[in-house]
Amino acid sequence: MNDFGIKNMDQVAPVANSFRGTLKRQPAFDTFDGSLFAVLPSLSEDQTLQEVPTGLDSVSHDSASCELPLLTPCSKAVMSQALKATFSGFQKEQRRLGIPKNPWLWSEQQVCQWLLWATNEFSLVNVNLHQFGMNGQMLCNLGKERFLELAPDFVGDILWEHLEQMIKENQEKTEDQYEENSHLNAVPHWINSNTLGFSMEQAPYGMQAPNYPKDNLLDSMCPPSATPAALGSELQMLPKSRLNTVNVNYCSISQDFPSSNVNLLNNNSGKPKDHDSPENGGDSFESSDSLLRSWNSQSSLLDVQRVPSFESFEEDCSQSLCLSKLTMSFKDYIQERSDPVEQGKPVIPAAVLAGFTGSGPIQLWQFLLELLSDKSCQSFISWTGDGWEFKLADPDEVARRWGKRKNKPKMNYEKLSRGLRYYYDKNIIHKTSGKRYVYRFVCDLQNLLGFTPEELHAILGVQPDTED
């Protein structure tokens, strides 16, 4: 047995005897070419131990030998979250200095205040603020490449990331508000009287009505979500002749086709009041005709018994929307159309109701009436049997169907309930106190639909809700 504890070397390694020899120790480095380490700096060179490397000189020019891990989408997400947490400190500065959340609205001074905050936050040096002597709109229009040229080295990406995050957050907030407010853009004001705060004396047929305060008129007809910029861009699309005068015809139940020519817009009209920020919702209309239809449905200028017609806005108005039809109830309107209610179909189809009221796109309150008048939907929404009160037995299902109708896959009950809350101030729908998911129509549905609650309940087979 040798020193290595092996009894017979021949049994372990049957190697030819001619190759057997004494084992010798040899440094492992002797087998490598010394040129392998030629790239390493030598202490005998000019560089000394006291020198501090810059971090750039010692980087190898051979990118293939780089062992740094690549920036993966996961690591990017982590970095983005970390930066977002750091940037949250700027929100406090925004509140203190009154800087708008939307960077597009910043003044030149507010751009400078943002850069000063970043300079202090990240301990930046040699930041030339004069290079950013511009307002927020110009800043956002720079683009990333131009922005990085103006920004200090190594921090331009961080500043641009912050700017992009603020722009994205503002866009998401605007989209959410548009989604919540879209169903109110054309709420007919015959539901809520005295909306404009003044009444209009009836002028004889063919006479021009007196001029009214133009600022209040425009503010009332344009929803808060319609910014002056969006309004101006839409008005530019209209022919000049249509900008000067818009004819609005009204009908009264007690009179035959009285008409008023209301001078809504002219060259001397006052400018609508500026809103603080388009963060309130910068809604834009799809076309000039849709803008006029929205005004027509929102600015009846009269009381509950007056309904605006479409005749002045659309020459190709269908016969179903003529004045004689709008003077009747929805029930009579359906009978006049010879459209009997089919078995298993809603008694009040939302699309037909929207056409009858002239509201344009289907509104949330119209959609709820459709569900409430459909027997197949009583498992998740139904009348309680107490007047116009109704209950959402499955609010998530109601929200899902509303999202499907409006092509909003992300719709949920939280967003739906926010939409319902907008109707509170309009006196269209109120929440029933002390009852969960229970609401009540407080507008004059009986006059609109031509049904009493009891008649509609009988048609649908609704039994009074005995639950507390």
Swiss-Prot record:
Q: Which residues bind DNA?
A: 362-442
Isomerase found in the keyword field: no
Kindly list the positions at which Phosphoserine occurs in this protein: 220, 225, 294, 297, 300
User: Which SUPFAM superfamilies does the record cross-reference, listed alphabetically?
Assistant: SAM/Pointed domain (SSF47769), Winged helix' DNA-binding domain (SSF46785)
Which PANTHER family does the UniProt entry name for this protein? ETS (PTHR11849), PROTEIN C-ETS-2 (PTHR11849:SF188)
Molecular-function GO terms, alphabetical? DNA-binding transcription repressor activity, RNA polymerase II-specific; nuclear glucocorticoid receptor binding; protein domain specific binding; RNA polymerase II cis-regulatory region sequence-specific DNA binding; RNA polymerase II transcription regulatory region sequence-specific DNA binding; sequence-specific DNA binding
Membrane-spanning intervals of the chain: none
- Write the protein's name: Protein C-ets-2
Spell out the InterPro entries in the cross-references: Ets1_N_flank (IPR045688), Ets_dom (IPR000418), ETS_fam (IPR046328), Pointed_dom (IPR003118), SAM/pointed_sf (IPR013761), Transform_prot_C-ets (IPR016311), Transform_prot_C-ets-2 (IPR027276), WH-like_DNA-bd_sf (IPR036388)
**Keyword terms of this UniProt record:** DNA-binding, Nucleus, Phosphoprotein, Proto-oncogene, Transcription, Transcription regulation
Q: State the compartments where it is located.
A: Nucleus
Q: What family does the Swiss-Prot or TrEMBL record give for this protein?
A: Belongs to the ETS family.
GO cellular component assignments: cytosol; nucleoplasm; plasma membrane
Q: Does the keyword Transcription apply?
A: yes
- Encoding gene per record: Ets2
The known PTMs are summarized as:
Phosphorylation by CDK10 at Ser-220 and Ser-225 creates a phosphodegron that targets ETS2 for proteasomal degradation.
Any idea where the PNT domain is? 85-170
